[in-house]
Amino acid sequence: MAKPKKKMKKAAPKARKAAPKAVKPKKPAAKAVKRAVAVKAAKPAKKISGRKVADVVTATTRASVDLESSIGRMERAAVRKVGEIAARATRAVRDAISPPIKLPSYDELPVRAGAPAGAAWGVFGDDDEVGTINLLTPERVIAATSSIRTGKVFALNLPINIPDPPLFTRGKHTHTVKIFPNAEFVLDDFLDNFYPQASSQWDALAHVKHPIHGAYNGIPDNQMTGRGGMRLGIDNLARRGIAGRGVLADVARYHERVGKSIDFTTAKSIPLEDVQAALEDEGVELRAGDILLVRIGWTKFYLSASDEIKAELAKETVVPGIEGSERTARWLWNNHLAAVASDSPALEALPKPPGEEMEFLHFHMLAFFGMPIGEMWNLEGLADDCAADGDYDFFLTSAPLNIPGGVGSPPNALAIK
């Protein structure tokens, strides 16, 4: 009888490996991505025809060329724009230095038949009422902005109550401040007996006429005052505005350097050569359309003077100033200045020194040239800054009061460095 087979014992199971760490269930989105990748891999890759490759290369090349072309157009446009700006700036500086229309020299005046010798009547038109301010063209105004270097601003007006007492027999104004009617929280004020030329000022072209030849451009008296009209008034300058390159001739500092002095209680005439030497010493050149400011030191003297001296000057105004001669007038015109202002009360010496009685510079400038005159400007702060940095040119603006037919106005002038 066959022996029954023994049951084989099952081998002991091997030791199980350590259970793996629990893995966070993957997000459904990740599984979906995995399935999509698997399906993509399972599908046989489509063959790309050579034609499609060529089309892609062509399209890419065209896009690259278009991009380069666009960049090139932009670069060329930028270069053109910069060139246009540079050309405009070059023209502005060129026009500022040399007027686009050649002006006659002093010895070539007059240009209008019947006008007196040395008169610029008709140069700016037979009906002109602003004279040499016409030289402040847009091109020159743009060029003048290059004189702004630091952004410093200097106000050139004295307070309207200085000089005190007023000079040249002018009256003293009164200033009244009052509460506005029916509004106790509002103040109002007004001036009585206000003389627009009692302090820092512009002389309008109507201010002085030649005793024989009359006013600028031959405009008759009956068109300047009364019912006949108000021509040559300060309103002409006010409506236009004054802006351009200013240049300071600091004659007072030049005198200090060379050991000269001025007695401000006398009518001493300062030679033209001193003005020219001051400009040369500063290293600044005049250009057509410049507004020349001449500092002789009078304002500094007056502000520190005693009450007795101020009272004496009010009683009899005796002041120094630049030489009031025809050669000075010739120099001013030949430099084609737009205007001239000074810190002195009359620009020139008054009363007229011996030998200069009939050479009143106001006749030449206002009546013959149409060149506005500024007087009693406060140039002290500006002069100190120019001496400190060595830059004697600046951008100058002035907004006279719009007084119809007025013969003068505070300048409301600013020098911007």
Predicted regions and their residues:
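Low-complexity, polybasic segments enriched for Lys interleaved with small residues
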Residues: 5-50
